[in-house]
Amino acid sequence: MFHFSIGTVLISICWLAQWMEAKSQRIDPDAENELWDSIKHTKVQNIVEKNAIGEINSPPTDGTPYLKVVCISDTHEQLHNVTVPDGDVLIHAGDFTNNGKREELIKFNEEMTRFPHKYKLVVAGNHELGFDHDENQGERQDADKGLGTEDGYNILTNVTYLQDKGVTIDGVTFFGSSYHPLRGFPFYRNRAEQLAECWKAVPNDTNVLITHTPPLGYLDQFGDERWGCRDLLKTVERIQPAYHIFGHVHEQHGVLSNGNTTFINAAQCNKGNQIQTRPIVFYIPKKTLS
């Protein structure tokens, strides 16, 4: 009969985790499926259920002041077909247009005025052509070449546009960034080197992180492929924001939790860019200075 001490077991677990991490570092960073398979055994993914009106939690009942946050993404020129509940903060995680045309941006900006939310936070998606100064437009798909609006975010006067920027609302820190690993679109950056550097901009005190792309393995599956970013997942696990809001993968609308962070894919459209889901709502306590 073999006898193992608790210390021996803990050492074995730590060794296994280190071995899995070392193994993942040797995998081609573009081999997303293989990469996820090498680390998924160490990840926690609990499904968070929504109620009939899209809420994933309840407001505090002890008198604690709170923000009601409403999350949408990937509306693709169909925002007028979305029933958006009232709240304090409205988040749009990108792809509000189909290709960033000026008329699409004007329409979106005007549509956002009809919502009563005091704060409207927006990040760009890969379909907001012209928003990324550093885009290699020669890599665009043929159908997208010549389209978009350079510096089109300047048209968005009715929202707070976040690109590597943050805002603090009643003590709650929000930070937004649009980078993703899908080649041929604005805000594309290659996996590992460039994206790892991009995510260093996320402050350690971020409470609500808003990106367009999902992190690897969390509501990121498109067909047989994983579209998420490993380095983004590392960043989320390091800073542990209370919420991570994103979209990009239409088929994966939903909510997961790893125990520290709630991951929300707020995509509204299906593959045919028709609205098929409702916004997701959460409540977060305000923070007061002591």
Curated annotation (Swiss-Prot):
This protein's record includes keyword Cell division: no
Highest taxon of source: Eukaryota
Any Pfam family the entry gives: Metallophos
Signal peptide span: 1-22
UniProt keyword annotations, A-Z: Glycoprotein, Signal
Single GO MF annotation: hydrolase activity
Positions bearing carbohydrate: N204
Presence of keyword Nucleotide-binding: no
Family: Belongs to the UPF0046 family.
Name the UniProt record assigns to this protein: UPF0046 protein K07C11.7
